[in-house]
From Swiss-Prot:
Its EC number is 2.4.2.9. It comes from Mesorhizobium japonicum (strain LMG 29417 / CECT 9101 / MAFF 303099) (Mesorhizobium loti (strain MAFF 303099)). CDD domains: PRTases_typeI. The gene is upp. HAMAP family: Upp_B. Pathway: Pyrimidine metabolism; UMP biosynthesis via salvage pathway; UMP from uracil: step 1/1. This is Uracil phosphoribosyltransferase. Belongs to the UPRTase family. Binds 1 Mg(2+) ion per subunit. The magnesium is bound as Mg-PRPP. Disulfide bonds: none annotated. 5-phospho-alpha-D-ribose 1-diphosphate binds at residues 79, 104, 131-139, 200. It is an enzyme of class 2 (transferase). It comes from the Bacteria. Its cofactor is Mg(2+). It catalyses: UMP + diphosphate = 5-phospho-alpha-D-ribose 1-diphosphate + uracil.
C-alpha cells in the first residue's frame, strides 16, 4: 500500500500477538507497548540524515557519523500515544516532545481537541506523530492538521494497528505523511473499533473502561 510501511519484524509480530490477547494484564500490555515502540522506532528513523564530526577515541582521532541538524519531535496523541512515546524517548532521549489532547466523540466518532503543547520550531524538525491506533483516522488527521498549522512540514505517523478505512482517509487527507504500523487489520466495526484489533489501547494501558 503506497505510503504505508508495515513493520513485519518477527519480534514486533510476536509481541503484538501477546498484546492482542484479552488475558494480557495491564502491566504486561504497558511493558510490551514500550518494547514494541523501540522496534518500531528503529524503522521510522531508518533514513535520518547523517553528517560527520571529528571525535577522539581512546586510540586515535576519527571522522564519525552523527545525526544532522536539530533533533526530532515526538508528538503524542493523548492519552494512548504516551505508551509509544516512552519507548521512543528511550531510543532518542534528546528528542523534543509535543502533546496533542484529542478524544473521540462516541456519537459522531469525530476528534475533539482539548490540549496542545509543542516546541516553537516545528518547521525545523522532523515530527513523528505517535498514536497506537489508526482506526477512523479522525484523531490522526486532526493532530496533523494542527501540527501543520504550527509550521511542521516534515511529518511521519507511527501506530501499532491500522484499519484499511483509516489508511484510506488518512492518505487522502495527508498524502505527504508516510505511515508506519505493525499491522493492517481487517476492518472497523460499527463503533469504529479495529477488528480483530486489541481493544481500546488507552483502557488496556491504564486499566480503565
Amino acid at each position: 500500500m503506497k505510503g504505508v510501511t508495515v513493520v513485519d519484524h518477527p519480534l514486533v509480530q510476536h509481541k503484538l500477538t501477546i498484546m492482542r490477547k484479552k488475558e494480557t494484564s495491564t502491566a504486561g500490555f504497558r511493558r510490551l507497548l514500550r518494547e514494541i515502540s523501540l522496534l518500531l522506532g528503529y524503522e521510522v528513523t531508518r533514513n535520518l540524515e547523517l553528517t560527520t564530526t571529528t571525535i577522539e577515541t581512546p586510540i586515535e582521532t576519527m571522522e564519525a557519523p552523527t545525526l544532522e541538524g536539530k533533533k526530532l519531535v515526538f508528538a503524542s496523541v493523548l492519552r494512548a500515544g504516551n505508551g509509544l512515546l516512552e519507548g521512543l524517548l528511550d531510543l532518542v532521549p534528546a528528542a523534543r516532545v509535543a502533546h496533542i489532547g484529542l478524544y473521540r466523540d462516541h456519537e459522531t466518532l469525530e476528534a475533539v481537541e482539548y490540549f496542545f503543547k509543542a516546541p516553537s520550531d516545528l518547521a525545523d524538525r522532523l515530527v513523528i506523530v505517535v498514536d497506537p491506533m489508526l482506526a477512523t483516522a479522525n484523531s490522526a488527521i486532526a493532530a496533523i492538521d494542527k501540527l501543520k498549522g504550527r509550521g511542521a512540514t516534515n511529518i511521519r505517523f507511527l501506530c501499532l494497528l491500522a484499519a484499511p478505512e483509516g489508511i484510506e482517509r488518512f492518505t487522502k487527507a495527508h498524502p505527504d505523511v508516510p505511515v508506519f504500523t505493525a499491522s493492517i487489520d481487517r476492518q472497523l466495526n460499527e463503533k469504529g473499533y479495529i477488528m480483530p484489533g486489541l481493544g481500546d489501547a488507552g483502557d488496556r494501558m491504564y486499566g480503565t473502561k
